[in-house]
Amino acid sequence: MKLTLGFRRAVASCAVLLSLASAAASAKVFSPTVYTLSNGLEVVVVEDHLAPVVTQMVWYKVGAADEQQGHSGIAHFLEHLMFKGTPTVGPGEFSKIVARNGGEDNAFTFYDYTAYFQTIKADRLELIMKLEADRMQNLALTDDQVYPERDVIVEERRQRIENSPAARLGESMRYVLLTNSPYGRPAIGWLPEMQQLTTADAIAWYKTWYAPNNAILIVVGDVEPEAVKALAEKYYGPIPAHPVPPRIRPQIMMLPEGEHPLPEPERRVTLRDPAIHQPEFARYYVAPNYSAKTRKQALALEVFDEIFGTGSTSRLYQALVVKTKVATAAGSSYDDTALDPGPYDIFASPAPGKDIAEVESGVDAVIAALVKDGVTAQEVADAKTRLESQAILARDSLSGPAHSIGEALTTGQTIDDIENWPEDIASVTQTDVNDAMRGVFGAKAAYATGWLLPAKGTKAPMDAVAAANTTIAPSGAFR
């Protein structure tokens, strides 16, 4: 559960880091006030009286991974349509009202959740609660609103995926690695399925999943918990709860009719594109997350990620960029907050004159050494110090607490998990880290390798080229 900092902040010295870590390990993270309304809406309030500002977020426990065959993209589509108005607030008026009152708003969709947020002067909290509660139950959709917006999301996919070689590589790597998981399809959706979404699909999704008993209201800022509770009961309290289906994830990723996944055991993807001038290497491993059964491993992998691929002192950066100089950049990213196992990402950019195969060999060498010898006790101690400091830094914005809490609660964690995170990180041992690392990167590792190359020039291994050429994907998904 990486704490969201809002903005990356540099810590000036080791002395500051040590003092922050000491405080973080002995204190709670956000100290929220938590209650549940009679209709099942969870409410979380975090006080921050530094400025007369407030952030409201409403998180729904549904995302792209909950979509069914033939309807990929519907979660993100409805997110767009939530701004189309209600009987009392016209299309597009929601954001205009927020802006006229000096605030800003937006929304986002990922695999396990959909979230909506506003940041505004604290004395306007009642206004944004009224607006958000209104669209939780009164969204009004017509064909005239829905189908032009479908064109918008299709164009968004073209801009973000089709026109981005790096995004297409990432999409195809997820696909070949996570074929048996809904995380293997793009959160934005497969293009052919997006183009077939209807008004009825959007309304059905809204009526199925958008309910107070499937939502979390988070308020962070210059507020008093009792005042927030009174407003929540006034505006959200009257919304009736309704049964929400269990989040049953398919065991086999569903693709559009006639499409087939890449044959096993090949899990390599090479993408060539005329727009690419700088080759890129990527590797995705399947890793556990903060679910109840794998929380201990996730904590240990967070510590490992600090050692392995975070920053210029990491094992990966030092080996590839500083020592062998085969790369100009190298790092990793661990997606630990999710309902199901997901990718642990490694990336590197070859240095001028260096072949991408040298980069891959360098990455493999670093991983092999770690699997063989493990990390050191000092590396673990230093990594925990850096991580624990985030517990204090995460309080320095309104969006940080709201995002960290919402992401955690929509993916099966509890308030206690969030508040005890510093202590849990402090309890991670060298053995824990090495065991978790070997579980992901050892002999039974599941991974996909990706090469992003210019249209001409650098040659890829034949098995990678063959794998890429045999990939059959939905039209527009990978190419």
Question: What feature does the model see in each segment?
Answer:
Residues 133-141, 235-243, 364-375:
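A common structural junction motif
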Residues 25-64, 88-123, 160-214, 238-291, ...:
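Non-catalytic beta-strand/loop surface segments
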Residues 1-6:
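N-terminal secretory signal peptides that target proteins for export/translocation
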Residues 11-22:
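Bacterial N-terminal signal peptides
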Residues 63-71:
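Short pre-active-site segment immediately N-terminal to the catalytic Zn-binding motif
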Residues 72-86:
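Active-site SXXK
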Residues 69, 126-129, 163, 230, ...:
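Solvent-exposed, non-transmembrane alpha-helical starts
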Residues 150, 203-235, 445-446:
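Non-catalytic, conformational "gating/processing" segments within enzyme and secreted inhibitor domains
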